[in-house]
Amino acid sequence: MICALLALPSTIAHATPQLLHLGQPHPYVFLAYTNSDLHQAQPAEHAVVIIHGVRRNAEDYYQTGEQLLTNAGLTPRNTLLLAPNFLTATDPQASNDLPLWPKDRWMQGNESSAGHRGITSFSVLDDLLAYLADRRRFPHLKDVVLIGHSAGAQLMQRYAVMGKDFTSLPVRYVISSPSSYLYLDAKRPTATGFAPIPDNRCPGYNRYRYGLEQPPAYLASQRLDAVQLFRRYASRNVTYLVGERDTHADSKVMDHSCAAEAQGPNRLERQLGYLRYEGFLSRTWGVAVAHRQFVIPEAGHDAGHLFASPKVAEVIFPNKP
């Protein structure tokens, strides 16, 4: 087991793995890298949570988050940085008391299947928000930014759609360069608009995680139809990012399934297509939506490069101190 670090200064200069005690009434521990000693009450007014990609390299994403905060003029004293680590049983940090997922299933919201079993990655995000809203720990916290990139953005986009209502703190969602998105009906982008795909061309393309057929229990238990889901999603503060050079259709870490290819040939086109889809649903269902979208100049898929762009700091923190 990885031991929590108990004798640290209130703010920490470098990435430090700590165990967060999450979940009520069934507690569990979760590994995260952070710039603060979470065993003390914190002075932070803002929290930034950044979710890693498919390689589960949370420490690298912590460093990416540090650069982002530096570019935005934010310091460890006023801004808590957290980089949670969704682990598998083969990762060196794994232990039996941590939730562990089979390979990339965490990005879909699935339950942990080893270590501490039965924890969905959506529940982890719910529990992280509840943890941050605890005034005993964070008496001055004003808002939370949830950032996901690549595989982390696949989780984040689905959580932004399906996550339960949270009213304790304002939450902003940043969805950066995922391979696919959750569509809310059977239509997909075409050259002239949106239309269903014939079943014989792509069987199962509308099943979860690409559509709402056969949804996970986390969503099914909420008993919301597609219009209700979209209305809630449209009301949330969502920002989309993608690099202008994230156009490699043969990328080894991009989803090449038929269901993903139905959303576009590359990450740039898939994101722009989804923004058009939001506009289509807005007109069709009479739901106003104003999510922001930014193509980052000269950036490809690399998280360190994309989030180092001064433009990204301006976009994510428009009201920085």
For each of these PLM feature ranges, what is it?
Residues 1-9:
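Bacterial N-terminal signal peptides
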Residues 11-47, 55, 59-80, 106-123, ...:
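A domain-start/cap signature at the N-terminus of enzymes
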Residues 33-35, 241, 275-321:
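C-terminal catalytic histidine-bearing segment of alpha/beta-hydrolase fold enzymes
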Residues 50-53, 83, 240:
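Structural cue for short, hydrophobic secondary-structure segments
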Residues 53-56, 179:
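Active-site glycine-rich loops that stabilize anionic/oxyanionic intermediates
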Residues 86-119:
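Cap/lid segment of the alpha/beta-hydrolase catalytic domain
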Residues 123-142:
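Conserved acidic catalytic loop of the alpha/beta-hydrolase fold
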Residues 170-280:
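The feature captures the conserved acid-bearing segment of alpha/beta-hydrolase catalytic domains
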